[in-house]
């Protein structure tokens, strides 16, 4: 689940199945629009890439599903970059702050993405491909034709097999390694697929459309709203308590207090919970995290969760990104509360 004061992501352990791409699928790949910002490479063109196999990967640095594909992309880049494969990462932002190039480049460095990147903040490449998904992969042959595509996670072996097929077409003498094994157990055939709470957006625009916020006060875009938690929580809905500014993309804390009395709460069923959050004022802020009314057990702690000397669990929000809050040892329904005593959590 993705929860943030921007949104909450309850991340499932699931894998997408390969789309049914016909064997004879063949569509000319569009040229990259002019005027794009390229990083980690000189500007590339489809015309100039003729003879290569090109994997165009649409990603977003706060997207958990994109992040889960990175180990496979890095493996393919390492194995096939000298055998004719060129990966082009197209970063198209979901949130306004993800348009900032510095944020994108820091994320690319942190994730170890070593291939050419396009900063697609105006959705130019996205529209050219008619794309609708993060992540999305389009595989292009030596003659510049899209021969395969996949949306979402999963189908890693099938995608790698298609890469090898097109590399063989480009160079029949090329020697290729075996298809890689699943990197995570949840990517293996037969892995359990749990019914998880869906992704939740807390901003007034998408949250209002989806009916995410369950408080009687509802959304009041542009205003600071004093919310009261009704106390009876339903699965998959968000409950706010305290003073929160309503914006299109986020709920933002506006009250500084001695104790963390303002909070966002949900009842969820998930193995993993992530949240996209940013420090609105550019300074680190602390968010306290409670699981079923108590600090998170260390066995269930996510990668970004910390503990103080009293065993209380918290996050330090020091940059706009996705924070991994919980990795539950056992799948179950739980309540999660994110509380703050500081200004500018959103």
Located regions from the model:
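Non-globular targeting/processing and membrane-anchoring segments
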Residues: 2-38, 157-346
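A short beta-strand-turn-helix
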Residues: 31-54, 77-80
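Short, internal strand/loop/helix patches
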Residues: 37, 102-140, 275
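Short active-site neighborhood of thiol/selenol oxidoreductases, capturing the structured segment around
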Residues: 43-67, 73, 86-88
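Loop/turn elements at helix/coil->beta-strand transitions in domains of secreted/extracellular proteins
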Residues: 50-54, 82-86, 112-116, 142
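Structural microenvironment flanking redox-active thiols in thiol-disulfide oxidoreductases
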Residues: 67-110, 121-125, 287
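Non-catalytic, surface beta->alpha helical segment in thiol-disulfide oxidoreductase systems
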Residues: 131-170
């Amino acid at each position: 689940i993705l929860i943030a004061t921007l949104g909450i992501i309850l991340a499932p352990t699931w894998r997408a199945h390969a789309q049914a791409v016909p064997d004879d699928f063949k569509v000319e790949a569009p040229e990259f629009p002019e005027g794009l910002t390229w990083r980690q490479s000189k500007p590339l063109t489809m015309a100039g890439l003729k003879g290569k196999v090109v994997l165009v990967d649409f990603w977003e640095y706060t997207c958990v599903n994109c992040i889960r594909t990175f180990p496979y992309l890095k493996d393919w880049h390492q194995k096939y970059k000298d055998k004719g494969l060129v990966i082009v990462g197209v970063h198209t932002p979901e949130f306004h702050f993800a348009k900032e190039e510095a944020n994108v480049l820091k994320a690319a460095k942190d994730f170890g993405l070593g291939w050419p990147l396009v900063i697609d903040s105006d959705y130019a490449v996205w529209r050219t491909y008619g794309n609708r998904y993060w992540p999305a992969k389009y595989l292009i042959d030596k003659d510049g034709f899209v021969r395969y595509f996949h949306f979402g996670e999963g189908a890693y072996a099938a995608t790698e097999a298609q890469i090898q097929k097109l590399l063989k077409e480009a160079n029949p003498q090329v020697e290729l390694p075996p298809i890689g094994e699943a990197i995570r157990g949840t990517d293996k055939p037969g892995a359990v697929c749990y019914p998880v709470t869906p992704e939740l957006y807390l901003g007034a625009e998408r949250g209002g459309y989806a009916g995410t916020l369950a408080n009687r006060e509802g959304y009041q875009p542009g205003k600071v709203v004093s919310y009261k938690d009704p106390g009876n929580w339903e699965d998959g809905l968000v409950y706010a308590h305290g003073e929160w500014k309503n914006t299109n993309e986020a709920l933002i804390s506006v009250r500084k207090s001695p104790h963390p009395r303002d909070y966002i709460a949900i009842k969820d069923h998930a193995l993993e919970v992530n949240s996209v959050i940013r420090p609105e004022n550019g300074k680190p802020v602390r968010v306290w995290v409670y699981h079923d009314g108590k600090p998170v057990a260390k066995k269930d702690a996510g990668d970004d969760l910390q503990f103080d000397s009293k065993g209380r669990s918290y996050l330090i929000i020091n940059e706009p990104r996705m924070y991994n809050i919980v990795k539950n040892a056992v799948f179950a329904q739980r309540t999660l509360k994110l509380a703050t005593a500081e200004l500018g959590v959103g």
